[in-house]
From Swiss-Prot:
A lipid is attached at residue 20 (N-palmitoyl cysteine). Mn(2+) binds at residues 67, 139, 205, 280. The gene is psaA. CDD domains: PsaA. Part of the ATP-binding cassette (ABC) transport system PsaABC involved in manganese import. Binds manganese with high affinity and specificity and delivers it to the membrane permease for translocation into the cytoplasm. Also acts as an adhesin which is involved on adherence to extracellular matrix. GO terms for biological process: cell adhesion; metal ion transport. This is Manganese ABC transporter substrate-binding lipoprotein PsaA. It comes from Streptococcus oralis. Keywords: Cell membrane, Lipoprotein, Manganese, Membrane, Metal-binding, Palmitate, Signal, Transport.
Length: 309
């Protein structure tokens, strides 16, 4: 009986050791953190900080709308297996069809334990006429200062889950935020030199509020957010009437939306569409705008050029 008791203790000890080993994700164990990001922008910021220390899966494909998405079986599997999940929050993946809320519930994941909003700490801007939870404008990353907040939040959670690589994450965070900060300062100087009467960024979706606040360029749009009606005759008429009262030289259309409504606005106002710009997604790998940094630099350059015409 005593021998049986000893064997039982040894067995339980082995199980405990195995459990501890399997739960530890660091360089010494040879196991990488399994990390999921909801879209390509968050995934790219994560990659810049974590490098090859993690296995990373991005849910919403490049070029697709993250407001309303239907997760694939692979997304469900990766989310269930993930050690760490990063999502934007502030009404992006949890608005519309609330696809992310359903995904993490099905995966039995817990907020602020398994999944984290990278927008934590951002000064939230709300949709026009709204000021309540669920009515936030989610496009905070279009202000580079917020992009730096995202990066810091991501690094914080990576370090918490994988402390053995703390110095690696901190060094990458420092280098990355310095790079973003330099671009941010250059952009503010660039937009200061554009005449006030030309300062109006016109897009299909009203997603440039954070950009407008950061760089002093007011914005106008056809529809406010991609979860509502998009490009109705009434929406187009309202924008056309507004633009006829301005001297704005150029229009812009986002890479992830149907460009036909903006083409109608352009025809009705004789204002050309200057460029396609990025909002909800980076570009395909190898193309201009295929990272958060390069998409923001591209946007800033093209918008400044278009408004200087």
């Amino acid at each position: 009986m005593k021998k049986l008791g000893t064997l039982l203790v040894l067995f339980l000890s082995v199980i405990a050791l195995v459990a501890c080993a399997s739960g530890k994700k660091d360089a010494t164990s040879g196991q990488k953190l399994k990390v999921v990001a909801t879209n390509s922008i968050i995934a790219d910021i994560t990659k810049n900080i974590a490098g090859d220390k993690i296995d990373l899966h991005s849910i919403v494909p490049v070029g697709q709308d993250p407001h309303e998405y239907e997760p694939l079986p692979e997304d469900v599997k990766k989310t269930s297996e993930a050690d760490l999940i990063f999502y934007n929050g502030i009404n992006l993946e949890t608005g519309g069809n609330a696809w992310f809320t359903k995904l993490v519930e099905n995966a039995k994941k817990t907020e602020n334990k398994d999944y984290f909003a990278v927008s934590e700490g951002v000064d939230v801007i709300y949709l026009e006429g709204q000021n309540e939870k669920g009515k936030e404008d989610p496009h905070a990353w279009l202000n580079l200062e917020n992009g730096m907040i995202y990066a810091k939040n991501i690094a914080k959670q990576l370090i918490a889950k994988d402390p053995s690589n703390k110095e690696f994450y901190e060094k990458n965070l420092k280098d990355y935020t310095e790079k973003l900060d330099k671009l941010d300062k250059e952009a503010k100087e660039k937009f200061n030199n554009i005449p006030a009467e030309k300062k109006l960024i016109v897009t299909s979706e009203g997603c440039f509020k954070y950009f407008s606040k950061a760089y002093g360029v007011p914005s106008a749009y056809i529809w406010e957010i991609n979860t509502e009606e998009e490009g109705t005759p009434e929406q187009i008429k309202t924008l056309v009437e507004k633009l006829r009262q301005t001297k704005v030289p150029s229009l812009f259309v986002e890479s992830s939306v149907d460009d036909r409504p903006m083409k109608t606005v352009s025809q009705d106002t004789n204002i050309p569409i200057y460029a396609q710009i990025f909002t909800d997604s980076i570009a395909e790998e190898g193309k201009e705008g295929d990272s958060y940094y390069s998409m923001m630099k591209y946007n800033l350059d093209k918008i400044a050029e278009g408004l200087s015409k």
